[in-house]
Design a protein with these regions (language model features):
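Membrane-helix boundary/interfacial segments in multi-pass membrane proteins
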Residues: 1-7, 183-196, 226-267
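Hydrophobic alpha-helical membrane-interfacial segments at the cytosolic entry of transmembrane helices
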Residues: 76-103, 119-124, 225-227
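Periplasmic/ER-lumenal interhelical loops and adjacent helix-loop junctions
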Residues: 97-209
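Membrane-interface transmembrane helices that cradle and orient dolichyl/undecaprenyl
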Residues: 15-31, 62-71
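Membrane-interface alpha helices of multi-pass inner-membrane proteins
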Residues: 18, 31-46, 87-93, 227
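Conserved small/polar residues in nucleotide/adenosyl-binding loops
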Residues: 276-283
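Short hydrophobic alpha-helices at membrane interfaces in multi-pass membrane enzymes
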Residues: 24-39, 74-85
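Membrane-interface helix-loop-helix junctions at transmembrane boundaries of multi-pass membrane enzymes
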Residues: 69-82, 166-180, 205-235
């Protein structure tokens, strides 16, 4: 549920911190933090959020690999990677029973493989996992991405238009009976309880950080940010969505692709915060 989603997300920053510590040479503390918070993430039992942040980890690993290649420190990189792999396995092993039963149960649900043979357009759906239409039902609109900067760019939440004092102050009283059946939101999603908004000032600091912050963390955060935004478009950008549904393991097990914007809500403020650290080309 949504409560466990927030609890899982709360364990993401210290997990990332453990990974960064390991690649900075602090193998013991990096390994301990990673093992502990990977275990707590999985215990929180919102696999979708942990799955999404696995992509963020890949961006971090890729950025540190590029740095190690460039600075000829590959042995240290592989040593840190080995420690992190062991730490992740420890965290997973602590939850192996729960993970196994979730996996076994999912095969008997709508996320498992259908026993029916489909033809025509229906055959284009996934052979196992959720249907494409269901996966992408909650897809963020391409222009709706501007809500990161302007929260009500698409009207805000799916509340009745009649509840907006601003709108009603300019509305024609002749059509007052219609306003209760119209929603303030006019984006591509079926409905929403509110936009994804990170703040104009935070977004300004993020853009500034793209030019000022040095080191591999910056490139990992920038890459993960744009990755999450493009994937959140779902049915509005099907070439990439189709690729992930067809070829990326487990991606077709999760619905509401717009929720991957939790990555951007993590990476944008983090890069903004890095502006307040002492400038150093090392990290």
């Amino acid at each position: 549920g949504h409560i466990w989603k927030f609890i899982t997300l709360a364990y993401v920053p210290p997990t990332i911190a453990g990974i960064v510590l390991a690649y900075r040479g602090k193998l013991l503390w990096g390994g301990i933090l990673t093992a502990l918070f990977v275990a707590l993430q999985i215990t929180s039992n919102h696999v979708q959020m942990s799955y999404y942040f696995f992509f963020v980890i890949l961006f971090f690993v890729g950025a540190y690999f590029e740095k190690a290649w460039r600075t000829k420190t590959l042995p240290q990189f592989f040593k840190a990677s080995a420690v992190l792999i062991v730490a992740a396995l420890v965290g997973i092993a602590a939850n192996v029973s729960n993970l196994y039963h979730t996996y076994a149960y999912s095969k008997e649900t709508m996320r498992g493989k259908s026993e029916l043979v489909q033809t025509g357009d229906a055959a284009k759906q996934t052979s196992s996992g959720l249907d494409r239409d269901y996966i992408t039902q909650w897809s963020y609109g391409i222009d709706e991405t501007l809500t990161l900067l302007v929260p009500n760019f698409k009207g805000g939440a799916s509340a009745a238009l009649s509840q907006s004092e601003t709108a009603m102050s300019k509305a024609n009283p002749m059509y007052s009976s219609l306003y209760g059946s119209l929603t303030q939101y006019f984006g591509t999603q079926p409905m929403t309880s509110g936009p994804v908004y990170v703040g104009a000032f935070v977004l300004f600091l993020f853009v500034l950080g793209c030019f000022i912050v040095k080191g591999p963390l910056k490139w990992a955060l920038i890459g993960a940010t744009f990755f999450s935004i493009v994937l959140s478009w779902g049915k509005n950008f099907m070439p990439l969505t189709d690729f992930f549904i067809d070829y990326v393991p487990m991606y077709n097990k999760f619905r509401a692709v717009s929720s991957i914007l939790v990555i951007a809500e993590f990476t944008i403020p983090l890069l903004a915060c890095l502006l307040y650290t002492s400038p150093s080309p090392r990290d």
